[in-house]
Amino acid sequence: MAQGNNYGQTSNGVADESPNMLVYRKMEDVIARMQDEKNGIPIRTVKSFLSKIPSVFSGSDIVQWLIKNLTIEDPVEALHLGTLMAAHGYFFPISDHVLTLKDDGTFYRFQTPYFWPSNCWEPENTDYAVYLCKRTMQNKARLELADYEAESLARLQRAFARKWEFIFMQAEAQAKVDKKRDKIERKILDSQERAFWDVHRPVPGCVNTTEVDIKKSSRMRNPHKTRKSVYGLQNDIRSHSPTHTPTPETKPPTEDELQQQIKYWQIQLDRHRLKMSKVADSLLSYTEQYVEYDPFLAPPDPSNPWLSDDTTFWELEASKEPSQQRVKRWGFGMDEALKDPVGREQFLKFLESEFSSENLRFWLAVEDLKKRPIREVPSRVQEIWQEFLAPGAPSAINLDSKSYDKTTQNVKEPGRYTFEDAQEHIYKLMKSDSYPRFIRSSAYQELLQAKKKGKSLTSKRLTSLVQSY
């Protein structure tokens, strides 16, 4: 049915440039065939109790027509295709705001071509406010606002408080024009107008099919849409749509901007990236390595004395001898050895035996500095400087010139992180040299083997006790 004159409309000069236009054209070809007088879907007027429902057809009619005329074998595929067309507003259920197709006796109606999405509609919030306001003026049960529409109306009324008188006048004028129409024509136009807004202001939770794919939009030469008012409102009282924000006209980039962009992409290319397969392998290997240390996944050794009758754990703690698992864990990485008090002690003893303990003592001193009260920090900074970094220091450490210069400047304003650069440099030196020597040393291997022997002797002793009983 043709649309009334109250809807002012300008020509859509950018219609063919819409990224969704190819889809729209294909859908409209199918809709044109559906509306064919001979081979299309039969449109009828259904008699209801004390009323008539004009120009409708059922959902099962659509599904059967699609199967027959588009050579679709699977009814599910036909239902899916019909749902996509309904979601774009080419036909709609007459009594539901959710635009979907059901293969049953639900009544549907075709949308007027004026409201087709191929017209590149981008309706304004003021248009939506006029529509909702007009609905409140018509005392019809079928025109009552849904909960989400009432919330939208209240929100728009707050947003357009200064313009609301003008919006109310527009809605009142539209309502007067609608009353002059024929009853059947008015019923059809009301449903088509409601379906139009169900597409552009969908029910919460429904997909907005008018949103443009950003990838397709970026390939367009002129991605701007023509902003058109559904009700012919003037530009000075419009507001931007919440789903479509106009893109400001951009100027060609300058040479400096291009240089900055090139520099940015070069930095991005130099960034270290890992494939997901490598990340997954790393996570799996970490899990396999630490699984025996998770008491939820593997029984702890020694067992928890609060849950068992074994007192080995307390005996080991009293003797301050680390368990085999604890010693083995030091070999996973230098961090594991440093965060274990016994591991630090054994590592320090090894370095003292090689007369190279100054690096670890410096690292431990800096860690201790970070935990000191703020009043003690300046004096402690000077002590560390005099012991490890000052000219002629008794335990001088080997720093590169860059780290030494930075630390020299930081000492002038002492703080907890004065030696951060120097500590990081020493950490790398220990990780690449001192720590591997410690793990390969006879001291560590003997400690590890001693724990294994102790465990085997304990197991033999337990076995003999069981056999004797």
UniProtKB/Swiss-Prot annotation:
GO terms for biological process: G protein-coupled receptor signaling pathway; intracellular signal transduction; negative regulation of G protein-coupled receptor signaling pathway. CDD domains: DEP_RGS7-like, GGL, RGS_RGS7. One of its GO terms (cellular component) is cytosol. Residues 37-112 form the DEP domain. Residues 255-316 form the G protein gamma domain. The keyword Nucleus does not apply. It is a peripheral membrane protein. Its main location: cytoplasm. Detected in retina (at protein level). Palmitoylated. This is Regulator of G-protein signaling 7. It comes from Bos taurus (Bovine). The gene is RGS7.
